[in-house]
Amino acid sequence: MVVDDSAVVRQVLVGVLNEAPGIEVIATAADPLLAIEKMRQQWPDVIVLDVEMPRMDGITFLRKIMSERPTPVVICSTLTEKGARVTMDALAAGAVAVVTKPRLGLKQFLTDSADELVATVRSAARANVKRLAARVTAAPLEAEVKHTADVILPAQTGRALAQTTERIVAIGTSTGGTQALEEVLTALPRVCPGIVIVQHMPEKFTAAFAARLNGLCQIAVKEAANNDRVMPGRALIAPGGKHLLLRRSGAQYFVEVLEGPPVNRHRPSVDVLFRSAARAAGSNALGIIMTGMGDDGAAGLLEMRQAGARTIAQDEHTSIVFGMPKEAIKRGGADRILPLGAMAREIVTQLQ
């Protein structure tokens, strides 16, 4: 079901989704009250939802759905500061992913974002709705060409050189990751290792996401900027639309924010971050891969393990989508499989 007050946007979204094999839009609605009436007749598997609508706003509608009958919801939002803030509220209320709304250049949307919309809806359809309901509190694929991390950071053999005692944590996640990261980061004490994070999310939204977490956590959380130092008690989140790499200078770690082609159809890519962590930190790193669709991060987590890092994959029961962790486990990249609730404790105890 597509719920949006713009007839033009509804038409574009329906056209894109109905052309995708295996997807059928069973209904549309111009506002949540109309959507509720139609859902009484036939309940959708996935809802694509605008957040700013008349009669009832999307957040109120989303909370009603999650309390009565948890259903995967994809937020379709504008690339504005206000839109980003409201989208963060929607993700906290149980939405599984966000895609950017078609702007006036609808032809450009069909060229650039149609595949992202279809892939995100497919991912949402596989979400663990029981975990969605339990996770409620008050990503996206890009180009079809699939690159590996080699296009950003060519592979090299051997473990990290020059020793240091400073520890770091690298986390990668996608669908369901906003809620998962909130659960992990809010449980961390102020004194903990420096953390670098890739969460698949469109540009413009990661700054609002980081700001929201910063207000909830004991640790500091910010959107990463080029040459930011990775320091204890702070988490850096990759900006949407950019790759994030870990670099080493003497005994200190810094991040590099790079342009470049999508890797595993994602930008930022978890594989890019994990490969750079394997190279820069070696056995001083802890790699964690959490809920998400696809295989981004699976190869990189294995590289981290081979470089001497401790590595963890989230278990199936607590994952919204058990795709990325499953693939990492399958390839031998995870030396431990843990539920989401154990991640924060593991970060503190393993890296002491």
From Swiss-Prot:
Gene Ontology cellular component terms for the protein in this record: cytosol; protein-DNA complex
Top-level taxonomic group: Bacteria
UniProt-annotated catalytic positions: 174, 200, 296
Alphabetical UniProt keywords: Chemotaxis, Cytoplasm, Hydrolase, Phosphoprotein
SUPFAM superfamilies named in the record: CheY-like, Methylesterase CheB, C-terminal domain
Response regulatory domain span: 1-116
GO BP annotations listed: chemotaxis; regulation of DNA-templated transcription
Major subcellular site: cytoplasm
Catalytic activity: [protein]-L-glutamate 5-O-methyl ester + H2O = L-glutamyl-[protein] + methanol + H(+); L-glutaminyl-[protein] + H2O = L-glutamyl-[protein] + NH4(+)
Residues annotated with 4-aspartylphosphate modification: 50
Pfam families, A to Z: CheB_methylest, Response_reg
Cellular localisation: Cytoplasm
HAMAP family reported in the protein's UniProt record: CheB_chemtxs
Similarity remark: Belongs to the CheB family.
PANTHER family linked to this entry: PROTEIN-GLUTAMATE METHYLESTERASE/PROTEIN-GLUTAMINE GLUTAMINASE, PROTEIN-GLUTAMATE METHYLESTERASE_PROTEIN-GLUTAMINE GLUTAMINASE
Name listed for the protein in its UniProt record: Protein-glutamate methylesterase/protein-glutamine glutaminase 2
Source species: Xanthomonas campestris pv. campestris (strain ATCC 33913 / DSM 3586 / NCPPB 528 / LMG 568 / P 25)
High-level lineage: Bacteria, Pseudomonadati, Pseudomonadota, Gammaproteobacteria, Lysobacterales
Gene name of the record: cheB2
